[in-house]
Structure formats: C-alpha cells, structure tokens
Curated annotation (Swiss-Prot):
One GO location term (cellular component): nucleus
Function: Required for correct translation termination and probably involved in regulation of hypoxic gene expression.
Compartments (UniProt record): Nucleus
Record keyword Transcription regulation present: yes
GO biological process: positive regulation of SREBP signaling pathway; regulation of translation
Region (Disordered): 1-41, 230-262
Organism: Komagataella phaffii (strain GS115 / ATCC 20864) (Yeast)
Protein name, as recorded: Enhancer of translation termination 1
InterPro entries, per the entry: Nro1/ETT1
PANTHER family for the chain: ENHANCER OF TRANSLATION TERMINATION 1 (PTHR28290:SF1)
Residue spans of biased composition, Acidic residues class: 234-252
Amino acid sequence: MAPPKRPLGLGKSAQKKKQKTDEDGVAESGSSANASELTVELNEEVDADDEVSQLFALWKTFLGAEKDNELVLNGIIHECDRLLRNSQTEKNKYKLNGEFHAIYALALNELAFFHAAKENDVKPYFDEALERIDLGLSHSKEDPRLLFSKAHIIFNRVPLEYISKMTPESSSEGYPNILEVLDDALKSYEAAQNEAIKTERFELFDQETFRVLDSLDDLLSIIDDFGKKKSSDEGIDSEDEEELGFDEDEDSLQLSESHPLKPLGESEKYDIWWRTQTIEFLKNLEKLAQKSDIILKDSSLPIGNLHRDVCKKLGQSYLLEAEEPSAIFTTLEYDSDVEDKEDGINGLQADQARDIAIQLVTEAIQYLEKAEYSDDPKSWADVAEAYVTLGNLHSVDSREQEDCYSKAEKRLQHANKATHGKYEHILNNLLQKSYDDT
C-alpha cells in the first residue's frame, strides 16, 4: 500500500487567511502562493490526521532533498505559523513541543540563505528564528533540540549577516563582539549535548545535529579565507595589494587591531572546540548504534553514512594539521638551500616536527580506517594516501616506512581494480618510490 499523500492543511489555511501586514514579521511574508499545491509523501507510520507529524515529515523531506526547494521551505513556515496560531485558540488549544519550535526556527534560518543574495539585510530572518527558539525554551527550558538549533542559527548568522558586510578596512564599530556571539552558541550546544547524554537521548546525535558542527566548520573556513590574497587574474595588482595591507611575502591580509575578525583569526579556541565536540559526537553516535544493535559499517543505513562522514572529516582535520610540521621536517631534513638549520623553523627542529607530524597522521589514519567501507573504493584510497604520508615521515628503508608503503600499496591495488584504473597513477608513483628507495 502506497504511503498517503495530502496537502498538510496548507490549502485550507491559505483560503482562510489574507496576506499579513508588515507587523506580523518574516514568517508570513516568506510563505508562497503556491503553498496550497504542496504535497509530501508520508511514511506509513505517520498519522495522516496528525498535522504536527505531517509537518515533521515535510521538514525531513526538505532536509533530505538533493536540492534546496524554497517552495517546500515556504510551505513549512506557512504551516508552522498556522499551527502556532491554532494552538493559541480555545477551540484548538494544544501543546507544541520543542521539536516544533526548532523546525520553525530552522526553517526561518534556511530562508535567510535564499534571500541573502537578493537582500542587503537578513537580520529579520535570524531575529525571528531566535525568537522562535526563545518561545520554545519558555515552555521546554532544557530541550536539547532547541538548544542545538540555537547554536546552528548563530553559526549561520555570523557569516551571513556580519562577515558578508565586512571589508578588510572594517572596524568593530557597528558589529557585535563576534567572540561573545560565538561563545553563546558554544554554550548552547554544550548544554544541549549534556542534556541529551544525561537523559540518554542518543538519537539526537543525528545528521541534523552534525549539521550544527558542520556550520561552525564552514564559518571557521570563511574566517581563515577572509582577506586571502587574490590571484592576478582576479584583478589585484601589486599596488592594490600594498594599499590593502598585504605583506610582500605573505598571502594573507594583515587585519588591523580594530577589525572585528582580528581576535578570531588569532585564536585556536574554536578550532579546538570543533574537533573536541566532533569526537564527542562520534562517541555518542557509536553509543546509539550499540544501544540499537546497529552495524555502523552498513552504508545502506543513514547512521552508517553519517558515521563514515564524521570519521572522514576528523581524519581530514588531523591530516590538515599535520601539513605544517610535515613541511618543516621535509625542509630541514632534505632542502640543502636552507641555511642555519640548527635554528629550526617556527621554533621546531627537524626531529620535533617529524614526531608531531607522525602523531597527527597516525590519529588521522585511525579515523580514516573507521571511515573505510567495503563498498567505497575512495575510502580505501584515502587511507592509502595517509599511509604514504606517514611512510614519508619515517626514515628511508626503515621497517616502519616499508610497513606503511605495503599497507598503502594493498589498498591502492584493491581500489584501482574496483574502479578500473582510477588510481593507476598514484599506485605507479608509490611503486616507483618504493623501487627508488631500494
């Protein structure tokens, strides 16, 4: 029997209500005239007469879609507004839980992305989204989903509302203290995590919560890239670079002390927090799998794909961190043009840099091996390349190096065969390197 379809009450609601005036806020103005045509396929376990359950199904449809659909998003906001109004009447009075308020807030948050390119100010969307969070928290003070959602909205707000308006010459005047804004988000996320663990609600460590951590990761990347020197084909010449404040030997802009992003660029706090919380998220995801008797390395299950994505992201973060000490070791060990090698680079001698790099790459491999799935040749190649990197850090012809290259070769041969030669070039380079070292 096919799952039921129905328009979620959107058409009925649209017929009864006129377009709202400005004082009613963003939510109503975001609704679409086509919302009445919106239908969603419900799972069999969803009650076709339960409008709140239907809203949850519609939200899951939006999140799971390959391409964002503004019509669906407007329909969600329209339906949230209708349900909220109905819940406040004597005739239809009923309680809306934290999940409802979280969906309403996150839908407004997502709507800001659609309007960012068309409007100068997305502030009203984020203001109203956080108002919906506060409304939900007034009824469910420690609801983890609401607290996770609050962090998500803040992590999106910073780049979309604040950083998008900044230039290299911007000063802190006119902007909030970005560190305080982010700290509010960290506090909210940690409170949500603690409550979810305390109440053993491990099902909350899902794709939606991982999107919160992803949004912070994206934000940190934006901050890292802010003021990076553009290539000559983008219209920046040497005189422009000097005027903007680029150092001659550096690729990044030197922000003034009064720039709102200056403190963030100098702090590692948020990068460390992201990794710490991502590791904690992974542990809780694995607890959920254990509690539910789920085999994680099953890519046919959503939790299996999520587990792979989290492990891969952690592995890549350790590899990225290893790049600097690896480069320092290689330069000091093999570059004959470097003078005063005994002074080291960035306070590190060759042996120190190598030890740090080995530790980081070893950590990376542990996570990448967790992300290694039997039906994913790319995951085998990712582990192989990490083993090559680790092998390059060990002494030439050492047992450790040979062991690393051997593990890499086996995986690359397997991946190359499965993909009909996709990794032939990498495999040949490894074999040639092994041959040259003998």
